[in-house]
Amino acid sequence: MRFILVFCLVLVCASPIHAAAPTKSPKPSPISLNIRTAGELANACTVTPTSQAGFAQLNFCNGFAQGVLQTDRQNPNGTKICMPSPSPKRSVTMKEFASWVRADVSRKDEVASVAFLRFMAGRFPCT
């Protein structure tokens, strides 16, 4: 019994420590999102997410929209937007926003947040 214990201890100590070390995968390159205009936001909101950059753009679009709406609601004099119940899917609304931006060339260069609030007020007016 003692021999088996010593043998196992020697076997464990003699085995190479790094034999099964996991391989490190290369770090992905950073994704830069610099969206300022309604046109840039429209592009981000309609990208097909087939890569990390595509997923990042789509996630940015959704987070941007949510952040703009929440911030605007904190302002007592903010934009009057009344969402129906049940609310439409965010992806559908953001595609509508992109179509709205692309329907008028002058909208593409507007500040993204301003254009988004204008779209939302027109799309979901309070009556």
Question: In which residue ranges do the predicted regions lie?
Answer:
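Bacterial N-terminal signal peptides
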Residues: 4-14
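N-terminal propeptides/low-complexity segments immediately following signal peptides
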Residues: 23-27
